[in-house]
């Protein structure tokens, strides 16, 4: 791992295999009921939490959960709707008689915690939050853990579209090219490690804007399908892996300022 000019570069000692992956969006969901069979649990979860947790469980569907060394998630903004709801409640009720549900569902590690509970996985569990840069850190951490343990590690990212996120991005001018880009949401998870099934990660670069590469897949080419959000890169990675283009492909988050890039090798 190397840090130069505040840009993180990580190249694993050996190419890191991708055992499986899954992405989910409101328009292209996974089967939440099958992956989270407890109806009471589903009812207590917000829409994005259900979607992201089910997406993570789907990526682990054909993996021995006893061989999972860690669950590492990332998010740009987390659950803004629940965060604002809890903050408003604190003010309106003068910090008394608070409903704990919005707080529990607003914490950044809620998704990784639910995946661990659903899969009975009692191992390393953490979340990275830094706009689009969180996924580069999460994926780097996951690959280092695969190298250290030789076991599977789940890594992914998620973000929501809500009025709160829309207000935030308009104030900061995020995702604007002339006019504002359509707002999107979704989750993408990759299960790393295990046997080589023909998909490998060769490296992570936390700022794609300094990179030149012959074969690039730009996240901006998926805006019409996905919309714009901080965690678009893990979703596009899963889509590209599902298409199985052969060779080395650099998947670039050019939607977000200083967005990261991931170099894949597929055969």
Protein language model regions, located:
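Conserved "HGTGT" condensation-loop signature of ketosynthase/thiolase-family condensing enzymes
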Residues: 1-129, 133-136, 144-151, 155-267
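Short-chain dehydrogenase/reductase
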Residues: 139
